[in-house]
Amino acid sequence: MNKGKFALLFTFAACFAVIVFFWLLAVPPENFTADRIVMVLLISPIFAILLAFNLSRFLKQHGYSLRQVHVALEQNIADFIYEFQRLVFIHLMPIAFLGALIFYYGEFTPAIAEFLSLFALIFALSPLLFLGISFFVAMLQVYERVRKKSLLRANFFNFWIWIHLFVILLIIISKVLVQPSELPFQKAYFKALNDGVFNLLIIATMNAIFGVTGRMVAREKFPILLHLSIPLVNSFVAVKILMA
């Protein structure tokens, strides 16, 4: 298999990993019936193929290739191994010890239990998530050069981001000021939005700990990261409502 085909295959695997990961977060375990599992397995490759094709086409339009992305990916994998070891011994060990103490002394509240269970879920699925995140981080390193050639498009993306943030802010304010029972048509969306944003914040925090996206934020690449996260929030909310 030549390098071009391998890069395309790896891109598909990365896209598939991200989509399946968000499906796992979006759908409650009790809703994972056999027919829905089959539906996820059938739908996810279709989205992964479309996403991989669009990414490949986008890079080719600007004179780049997937192979350049995978060169950057090799360095990210080396960084991940180092950051993962540091994460386990510096961050996870104290958290596990603190959790054991809280549990032993009987102060294991539902909120703490939910947080630790979500933390454990993210950590257990982190290899799957890392496969996708590493690819997108490498692509962003290439995209940083692409963005300089398309300032008009970048400005449009920033405007689009602020519009979405304004809409989300209005939704949050309206939820605080108006009880959901008074707006029954928005109850499902409110719940899905809260769950989706909360889980995405946990994912962002975990990746900042890993040091993968953390370094990118430090290099002022936050707008494009935000641009990628907003479509994920929207799709996440849609899946939550669909599978509720």
Swiss-Prot record:
Subcellular location, record wording: Cell membrane
Its organism's taxonomic lineage begins at: Archaea, Methanobacteriati, Methanobacteriota, Archaeoglobi, Archaeoglobales
Where it mainly occurs, coarsely classed, is membrane
Give the species this sequence originates from: Archaeoglobus fulgidus (strain ATCC 49558 / DSM 4304 / JCM 9628 / NBRC 100126 / VC-16)
Q: Transmembrane region positions?
A: 5-27, 37-59, 87-106, 116-138, 159-181, 196-218
Superkingdom of this protein's organism: Archaea
Q: What is this protein called?
A: Uncharacterized protein AF_2132
Secreted: is it a keyword of this entry? no
Ranges in coiled-coil conformation: none
Look up and give the membrane topology term: Multi-pass membrane protein
Keywords assigned by UniProt, alphabetized: Cell membrane, Membrane, Transmembrane, Transmembrane helix
What's any one GO cellular component for it?
Answer: plasma membrane
